[in-house]
Amino acid sequence: VRGDGDGWAFSDTGVRFWGRHGAAGLLLRAPRPDGIRTVLLQHRAWWSHQGGTWALPGGARDSHETAEQAAIREAQEEAGLPADRIVVRAAVVTASASGTSWTYTTVVADADELLPVVPNRESTELRWVPEHDVAALPLHPGFAASWESLRGLRLPG
């Protein structure tokens, strides 16, 4: 689905960032039946920007959306996640582009259990990954830069 946010934004140094109005991703956490904490990761399709890396379901924000709305919409599109099973806990700006208003916001959310997922064409795979195994994967550089601080967040609820 194309929205008015699809397209590149450019920093004052010429570096490009996806999302004309910024971008957002969903860090969805859920316990396995054995209690191990997991997060849902997307193995990005090879044709996509930074293809072949693991990251969060997410993408460009449209002009009328909050970061939370964009992250949940993208997770529905890319993973088939039901919005009514997701509880948003926080929104954290984890990247910005020099000289612009562009930001990437990670929306941290919880689900009571591992939810079934259905990948779209933007994913090679979707996987619930134990938190302690995330850093061992070939991560998208932006997600890699923020993972440890996101993992360390302790939120009420």
Language model regions located:
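NUDIX/MutT-family hydrolases
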Residues: 106, 117-151
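N-terminal leader/linker segments that precede catalytic domains of diphosphate-processing enzymes
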Residues: 1-53, 59-114, 155-157
